[in-house]
């Protein structure tokens, strides 16, 4: 059937129009992010009903989630109602309003369940079956594995003994059980699980398949060997330009001869590679060599680096791929064959017994849904059954959403009920393989990729492929930068799909033309000497600063009205790969009083209230578990103190269990009577609850504990009470759900919880935040899929990929099967086998490809602006990333395969575009004009150096030191104030021309020049300074008066910031009243008052400087400035080493037309014997002369007026500069 001509003025693009009306063959719509695929899918359904007269219940619409199904059905229903209202006489539309309720718009699991309910007789099962809960399924499978393993322990087959020796430890066989479980889940994701398990042994027995594996490794090795040879040649070329390096060149020439032999004839000679030594040691670079090449120091270092890279690449091939001879690898495969075959037998036994148990309990799980549906739809030979034929006749079209996330079983089910072949079928599939991120759920993106490569745009002889590439979500800056990154990152070799013109994103949203560049911010960690915070904590604080900046400066564009509004909390989302950073972010946002919510399905078991209840349950189940028993005793419920626990243990130091110590203490005549009574009450509770648990279900035991100790009421009254209460009720509800399964009892419930914790399967904190609540959100990339946000902060880019599974002794792969390491039972030594090496390499490639797709999902969530946050320990590593090798339009394959994290690739790609210092042979394009607009990145790269605030560091805290919060005690000249504010907000006019914006605090310049004057080498770096000084103090520190010197300095500055200046001076009583006012306003903490040096402040109030300020014409406090160093130092404009200076001036006052600045100092200093006040004053002036010079010159530069200054030391007095 031909596609109707698109009328003028319709909202659909040409590709969308084709997607709506294409028919007569299978259709695959590759719908890029934000391309409106849901709207297209709904419109296609509607047109099938309106234009083609098809009944809605004769369409099968398969969605990925139940929520998507409900939304889809609602949209279709609304459109039918609108059409029916417009044409009330249309009987067909009236019928559709009735039939919509029976329409098959659902997940595939729901369709399978309906199929089973209608044809249960074919399966010979009880029609009154129920679906097992997750808890029940986990426990039943665990129980089955235990029983099957016990049966095989009774048999003690030699292959089983070898398996247990290889996969179990002396202490447990947990790893063995885990591998069995993984194999079970892998197998049931295939249409024929038994057949898949039977084929696992084939590569171990057949030499033809072993030869294929060796070829696979050889091809992969060629990538690294070629890269190694390139690095070797670069090293040779660099050394060839130098003097006195003949010995180095000789070594490299020998290596080149060896490598030429390996690569001879275009083939990789693996035997020659493994049989010879490569990477001879280069001679040392002596002082004489350095002197002879003093103008080529960088080239010398680069040459050494290239040779080191050559050695590491060769070492990788020899250690990772061919650590042993090919014949030895094949021999190991023969030895492993019986073990692999026996392991498959165990898994088949587990599968059989597990199915038997489920049938006996009359329960089904989701895997049963799929396999029973397939059993109904196929004959024994695999051909479609009569029932399948009837469904083929019934469904006129099958529409599948999120097709990239289907697995092989689901694909087989769909093939049974679709009609025709690809060239004349009725299967409509929509999805985006670049967003296939569910491999851990056995999703198989290769299904999409195979069809994408096979189908054609015109559909001749096969299915039709349609590319939806126009993005209606994001600004063009987000799209072009995303395109640029993936154009150079993703291809068939790494990423599994080519990111070409058909795959890239095209701008389609009606935004205005204002500039909103993507921001790549690289945080360089402060070391332990300069910050008490860990790198992750520093990143969390930095993220908060980005959020504050968005809220203060950014706006959101309303496409409907064409106007802007201010950004709010809910416009911002923080995306990370996992929730590992959640706690740090929660604390950092809490410190700044910014509402923040973690949209988590993790972390539930770590919540204090949940841990308390679980400790209670574990202690009741078995009080001989010391950790949980003592945890319960120390909780808010029983409130035993540490010294009480110590008393108990001291009397019985050799007891195996603390419970025994409690009993012995109660019976000891020397025991403290009060503590004995307390312990008796505690043990009475334990015994009472134990008795209660024998006769009541777990949920009633939990309910009794809640009521007896007012647990709900207590935690509801704490910070975050709503969430805590929800968590407690959530655990109670899970216990009810557990009791509704076929399992019972406290022990089984605890075992179920332990299994969830071990598997990393979490209930998640109960969600008390709605979608419209005005909070900043954090979520994983997985949970953000399908969503969009005005501002996306994609952080955690420097967190390494999780390659833990690659280190396991057994590697699983849907396509290839099972790769098991070889274990020599006699020598008790493990070696990589041919299969484990090959499958590990394949798995690593698939892992990196999926991580790339996660990056794509994250980047394409942003509507207005995208922030990318990376973190490095030092800036030297950035130079290495800038110089990553390339191959054609992509980062070299070897670099991508071994990339440790997303930042590694993203920074390398974007820096190659921006940095002028990168050689042409490492750039993707020599001329920016070569780049098409759709993939020309618009990105600002900032290198940011983290540093904590100290008493000598200029304070940047926005809460107290914002120009917008200026305090003046006098009615100053508003024009002058506006002029000062305008000029102090000066910004470097050529900022758009800079590649890496640079900024230095005045304190840093002070330290820099001090270092230069001392003769020490100091590298001037471009940087931002970030300061945090208002961390929430632990209560025990406040109570013990242990406020640090830098905190006292910050406290004194805060008091001085708000100090009133009166001509009659303020009294000591008024000073106390003023500080009490700061406490009432929550500007300072209540416990901080004792640390304020009242006598020192009173000394200042009684000083001549205070009187001068009080009589001034204007007074301005806490003024930040950002100014070009070139203007201050009178350097030539365009000097590339010039930095932007950033600082904060404590106070400026104007008297008799002259501007004065004041800088407060809380320094402590030693008054050496014999030194006069004049000598001390001179010493202190010298200490801060550079900093003061910059203050004075900066103000004189931007005000164009005479400026004088004062230093005020609380422990010394006034110094006029």
UniProtKB/Swiss-Prot annotation:
ATP binds at residues 31-38. It comes from the Bacteria. InterPro entries: AddA, DNA_helicase_UvrD-like_C, DNA_helicase_UvrD/REP, P-loop_NTPase, PDDEXK-like_dom_sf, PDDEXK_AddAB-type, Restrct_endonuc-II-like, UvrD-like_ATP-bd. The keyword Heme does not apply. One of its GO terms (biological process) is double-strand break repair via homologous recombination. GO terms for molecular function: 3'-5' DNA helicase activity; 3'-5' exonuclease activity; ATP binding; ATP hydrolysis activity; double-stranded DNA binding. It catalyses: Couples ATP hydrolysis with the unwinding of duplex DNA by translocating in the 3'-5' direction; ATP + H2O = ADP + phosphate + H(+). Residues 10-475 form the UvrD-like helicase ATP-binding domain. CDD domains: DEXQc_UvrD (cd17932). Pfam families: PDDEXK_1, UvrD-helicase, UvrD_C. Its cofactor is Mg(2+). Its EC number is 3.1.-.-, 5.6.2.4. Keywords: ATP-binding, DNA damage, DNA repair, DNA-binding, Exonuclease, Helicase, Hydrolase, Isomerase, Nuclease, Nucleotide-binding. One of its GO terms (cellular component) is cytosol. Residues 476-786 form the UvrD-like helicase C-terminal domain. Heterodimer of AddA and AddB/RexB. The heterodimer acts as both an ATP-dependent DNA helicase and an ATP-dependent, dual-direction single-stranded exonuclease. Recognizes the chi site generating a DNA molecule suitable for the initiation of homologous recombination. The AddA nuclease domain is required for chi fragment generation; this subunit has the helicase and 3' -> 5' nuclease activities. NCBIfam families: addA_Gpos. Belongs to the helicase family. AddA subfamily. This is ATP-dependent helicase/nuclease subunit A.
């Amino acid at each position: 059937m031909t596609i109707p001509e698109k009328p003028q003025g319709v909202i659909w693009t040409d590709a969308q129009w084709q997607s709506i009306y294409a028919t007569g063959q299978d259709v695959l719509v590759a719908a890029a992010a934000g391309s409106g695929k849901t709207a297209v899918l709904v419109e296609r359904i509607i047109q099938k009903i309106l234009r083609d007269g098809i009944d809605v219940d004769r369409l099968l619409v398969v969605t990925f989630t139940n929520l998507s199904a409900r939304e889809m059905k609602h949209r279709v229903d609304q459109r039918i109602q609108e059409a029916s209202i417009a044409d009330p006489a249309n009987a067909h539309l009236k019928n559709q309003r009735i039939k919509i309720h029976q329409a098959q718009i659902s997940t595939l699991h729901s369709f399978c369940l309906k199929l089973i309910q209608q044809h249960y007789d074919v399966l010979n099962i009880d029609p009154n079956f129920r679906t097992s809960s997750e808890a029940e399924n986990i426990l039943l499978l665990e129980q089955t594995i235990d029983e099957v393993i016990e049966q095989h322990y009774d048999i003690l087959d030699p292959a089983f003994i070898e398996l247990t020796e290889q996969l179990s430890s002396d202490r447990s066989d947990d790893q063995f059980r885990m591998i069995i479980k993984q194999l079970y889940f892998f197998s049931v994701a295939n249409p024929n699980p038994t057949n898949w398990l039977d084929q696992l042994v084939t590569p171990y027995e057949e030499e033809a398949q072993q030869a294929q594996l060796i070829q696979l490794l050889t091809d992969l090795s060629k990538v690294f060997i070629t890269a190694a040879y390139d690095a070797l040649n670069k090293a040779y070329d660099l050394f060839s330009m130098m003097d006195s390096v003949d010995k180095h060149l000789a070594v490299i020439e020998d290596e080149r001869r060896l490598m030429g032999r390996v690569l001879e004839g275009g083939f990789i000679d693996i035997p020659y590679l493994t049989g010879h030594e490569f990477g001879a040691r280069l001679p040392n670079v002596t002082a004489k060599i350095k002197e002879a090449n003093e103008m080529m120091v960088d080239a010398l270092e680069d040459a050494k680096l290239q040779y080191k890279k050559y050695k590491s690449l060769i070492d990788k091939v020899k250690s990772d791929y061919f650590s042993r001879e090919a014949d030895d690898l094949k021999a190991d495969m023969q030895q492993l064959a019986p073990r692999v075959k026996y392991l498959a037998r165990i898994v088949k036994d587990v599968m059989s017994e597990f199915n038997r148990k489920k049938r006996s309990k009359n329960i089904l799980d989701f895997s049963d849904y799929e396999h029973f549906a397939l059993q109904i739809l196929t004959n024994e030979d695999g051909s479609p059954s009569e029932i399948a034929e009837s469904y083929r006749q019934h469904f006129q079209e099958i529409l599948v959403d999120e097709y990239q996330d289907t697995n092989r079983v689901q694909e087989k089910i769909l093939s049974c009920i679709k009609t025709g072949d690809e060239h004349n079928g009725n299967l409509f599939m929509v999805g985006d393989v670049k967003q296939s991120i569910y491999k851990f759920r056995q999703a198989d993106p290769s299904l999409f990729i195979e069809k994408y490569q096979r189908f054609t745009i015109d559909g001749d002889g096969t299915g039709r492929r349609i590319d939806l590439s126009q993005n209606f979500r994001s600004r063009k800056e987000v799209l072009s930068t995303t395109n640029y990154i993936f154009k150079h990152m993703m291809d068939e070799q790494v990423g599994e799909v080519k990111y070409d013109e058909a795959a890239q994103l095209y701008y389609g949203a009606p935004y205005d033309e204002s500039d909103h560049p993507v921001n790549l911010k690289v945080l360089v960690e402060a070391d332990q000497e300069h910050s008490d915070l860990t790198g992750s904590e520093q990143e969390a604080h930095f993220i908060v600063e980005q959020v504050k900046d968005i809220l203060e400066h950014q706006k959101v564009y309303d496409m409907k009205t064409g106007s802007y509004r201010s950004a709010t909390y809910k416009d911002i989302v923080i995306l990370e790969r996992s929730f590992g950073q959640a706690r740090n972010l929660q604390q950092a946002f809490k410190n700044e009083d910014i509402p923040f919510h973690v949209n988590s399905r993790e972390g539930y078991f770590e919540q204090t209230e949940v841990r308390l209840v679980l400790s209670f349950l574990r202690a009741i189940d078995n009080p001989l578990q010391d950790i949980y028993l003592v945890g319960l005793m120390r909780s808010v419920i029983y409130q035993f103190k540490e010294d009480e626990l110590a008393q108990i243990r001291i009397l019985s130091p050799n007891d195996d269990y603390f419970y025994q110590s409690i009993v012995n203490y109660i019976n000891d005549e020397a025991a403290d009577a009060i503590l004995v009574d307390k312990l008796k009450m505690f043990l009475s509770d334990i015994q009472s609850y134990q008795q209660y648990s024998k006769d009541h279900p777990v949920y009633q035991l939990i309910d009794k504990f809640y009521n007896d100790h007012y647990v709900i009421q207590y935690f509801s009254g704490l910070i975050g009470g709503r969430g805590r209460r929800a968590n407690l009720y959530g655990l109670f509800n899970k216990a009810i759900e557990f009791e509704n399964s076929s399992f019972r009892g406290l022990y089984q419930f605890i075992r179920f919880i332990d299994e969830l914790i071990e598997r990393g399967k979490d209930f998640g904190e109960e969600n008390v935040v709605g979608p419209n609540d005005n909070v900043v959100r954090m979520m994983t990339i997985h949970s953000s899929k399908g969503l969009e946000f005005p501002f996306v902060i994609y952080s955690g880019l420097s967190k390494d990929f999780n390659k833990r599974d690659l280190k396991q002794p057994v590697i699983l792969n849907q396509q290839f099967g099972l790769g098991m390491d070889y274990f020599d039972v006699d020598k008790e030594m493990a070696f990589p086998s041919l299969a484990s090496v090959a499958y590990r390499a394949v798995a690593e490639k698939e892992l990196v490809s999926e991580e790339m797709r996660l990056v794509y999902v994250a980047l394409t969530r942003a509507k207005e602006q995208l922030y990318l946050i990376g973190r490095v320990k030092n800036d030297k590593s950035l130079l290495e990333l800038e110089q990553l090798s390339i191959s054609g339009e992509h980062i070299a394959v070897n670099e991508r395969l071994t990339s440790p994290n997303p930042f590694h690739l993203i920074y390398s790609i974007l820096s190659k575009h921006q940095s002028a210092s990168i050689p042409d042979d490492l750039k993707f394009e020599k001329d920016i004009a070569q780049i098409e607009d759709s993939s020309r990145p618009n990105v600002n790269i900032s290198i940011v150096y983290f540093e904590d605030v100290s008493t000598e560091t200029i304070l940047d805290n926005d809460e107290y030191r914002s120009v917008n919060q200026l305090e003046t005690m006098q009615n100053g000249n508003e024009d002058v104030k506006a002029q000062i504010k305008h000029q102090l907000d000066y910004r470097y006019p050529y900022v758009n021309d800079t590649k890496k914006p640079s900024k230095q605090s005045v304190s840093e310049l002070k330290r820099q020049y001090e270092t230069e004057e001392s003769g020490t080498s100091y590298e001037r770096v471009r940087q931002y300074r970030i300061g945090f000084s208002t961390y929430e103090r632990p209560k025990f520190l406040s109570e013990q008066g242990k406020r640090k010197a830098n905190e006292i300095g910050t406290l004194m500055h805060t008091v001085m910031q708000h100090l009133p200046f009166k001509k009659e001076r303020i009294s000591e009583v008024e000073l106390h009243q003023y500080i009490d006012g700061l406490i009432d306003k929550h500007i300072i903490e209540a416990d901080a008052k004792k640390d304020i040096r009242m006598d020192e402040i009173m000394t200042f109030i009684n000083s001549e400087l205070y009187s001068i300020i009080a009589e001034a014409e204007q007074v301005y406090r806490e003024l930040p400035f950002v100014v070009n160093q070139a203007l201050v130092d009178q350097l030539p404009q365009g000097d590339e080493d010039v930095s932007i200076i950033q600082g904060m001036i404590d106070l400026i006052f104007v008297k008799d037309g002259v501007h004065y600045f004041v800088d407060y100092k809380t320094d402590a200093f030693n008054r050496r014997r014999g030194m006069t006040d004049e000598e001390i004053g001179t010493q202190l002036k010298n200490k801060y002369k550079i900093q003061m010079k910059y203050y004075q010159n900066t103000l004189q530069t931007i005000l164009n007026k005479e400026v004088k200054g004062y230093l005020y030391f609380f422990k010394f007095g006034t110094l006029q500069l």
